[in-house]
Amino acid sequence: MSFMVPTTFAAPQTYRLPCPTIQVQTLGPIVPSVWTIVSRYEPFRQLVVQAHLQDFLNDPQTIVTVMAPLCIPTSQTTQLVCTDASTSPTRVSVLDLSFEASLAMVQSVSVPGVLTTDTMNQSNYTAYRTHHPYRMLHVKSKPTILLNNTSHIVVGNVVASNGLVHIVDQFPMPI
C-alpha cells in the first residue's frame, strides 16, 4: 500500500498596501416606478389619486402594465380646498367622478404582468385580463395596435421598476 506523503507549500508573502478609505454611497432607484411615470400625465394622475391606487402602482412587488391615457373624457369641477388654517382657501379643479367610477377606470386599464408591444403584435386579436373583475382589454394588432377599437398606443414600452407603461391617445373603455 502506498500512502501519500503530506507536502507543504510556501505561501507567497502578502503586502498590505495603504489604501484610502472608500465611502460607499447608496443611490436611489435608477429606474422609476409605474406611479412616477404615470404621475407625469395630469388627467390620469388625478384619476389614480382619486381611486387611491398610487400605493398600488408604487409597490415594487406588484408587476403591472398600465395603459395611461393622455385625456380622460370627463368633466372637471372646481372645489375650495384649505391647505392651512392661516391661508385662504384656494380653488382646485378635480375630476367629476365618484370613487367607484375612478377605481373601475384605473383597474380597467391595468393588466397584471408585463405586456409589451411585441407580445401584442404576435397575434391578430387577443383579449387580456385586467385588474377589473369583468372588463377585458381587447387588442387588434394589424396594421397598428388598437385597444378596444378606440385608442392607439402613442408611446409604448416605457420601462418601470415594477412593470411597463404604454401611453395611449384616449381612454380605451366606455365610461
Swiss-Prot record:
FAS1 domain mapped to chain residues: 28-172
Transmembrane segments: none
Domain of life: Viruses
Pfam families: Fasciclin
Stated name of the protein: Putative FAS1 domain-containing protein 081L
Organism of derivation: Invertebrate iridescent virus 3 (IIV-3)
